[in-house]
Regions:
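N-terminal glycine-rich anion-binding loop in soluble enzyme alpha/beta folds
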Residues: 1-50
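Mixed-charge interfacial surface used for oligomerization/domain docking
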Residues: 1-18, 64, 73-93, 99-109, ...
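A short glycine/small-residue-enriched secondary-structure motif
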Residues: 27-31, 55, 60, 82-87
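Glycine-rich phosphate- or other oxyanion-binding loops that anchor nucleotides, phosphorylated ligands
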Residues: 37-72, 79-80, 125
Length: 227
């Protein structure tokens, strides 16, 4: 990412009283190994010092920064960044366009392309904000264990769901993470998600000519454990 002029601020998490950073002090394989071993994991956000330290470093080589944090509905890091940016005289634009995971990555790539096209940080911020409601994420979880840990489902509902082998499908649209549907197996859950994506494309874009690559929808799939 750095080679592209994109800088990544790692998100910290705590396990067994120790603070770690993904792919810096702990690999993804080690993370999932500990997760499956019932290790208690708590997520956090970068410290204000970590944020401003990165900004100060980048501003030595660039005039402006477009900072794209995790969605404000899912992390307090967005509000923190907005407050910190007030001390940078407009040189740092914090874009709260409600992105996470693959959509956040795409926003970073879009911002880079816009910068290369000559857009200012303020113009990039406006373009990204104008399209903040134009994405949906659908998530299928194989177990209710972690939703129960996070308080998103009650222990009783999780127990019933496990017995019935229910595979919940969640949706992120804007800042909200909501229940979308329930399936009785992985295949049915995948079908639900594919149909939901098709419906989104049809409702938002209609029929797109095969030759119209410019307006083609962007679709990505992500898997846990790098599968």
């Amino acid at each position: 990412a750095t080679e592209l002029g994109i800088y990544v601020l790692p998100m910290p998490f705590t396990m067994e009283g120790q603070e770690f950073y993904e792919d810096i002090s702990l690999t993804q394989a080690q993370f999932y190994e500990k997760l499956e071993g019932e290790t208690e994991i708590a997520t956090s956000q970068p410290s204000p010092e970590a944020v401003t330290s990165l900004w100060d470093k980048v501003l030595k080589d660039y005039d402006e920064i477009v900072h794209i944090p995790m969605s404000s509905g899912l992390s307090g890091s967005c509000q923190t960044a907005m407050l910190l940016a007030e001390d940078y005289d407009g040189r740092v634009k914090v874009v709260n366009n409600q992105r996470i995971s693959v959509t956040q990555r795409q926003s970073a790539l879009d911002a880079k392309a816009l910068a290369e096209a000559g857009k200012t940080a303020a113009e990039i911020e406006q373009i990204l904000m104008d399209t903040k409601m134009d994405s949906d994420i659908y998530i299928m979880v194989d177990t209710l264990k972690y939703l129960k840990k996070g308080g998103r489902v009650t222990p009783a509902a999780a127990a019933i769901g496990e017995i019935l082998r229910i595979k919940p499908v969640l949706q992120i649209h804007g800042e909200k993470l909501d229940a979308f549907a329930k399936a009785r197996n992985i295949k049915a859950a995948k079908t639900l998600m594919v149909n939901a994506v098709k419906k989104n494309i049809q409702e938002n874009l209609g029929e797109i000519p095969a030759a119209d690559a410019k307006n083609a929808p962007w679709i990505a799939m992500a898997h846990t454990q790098n599968e």
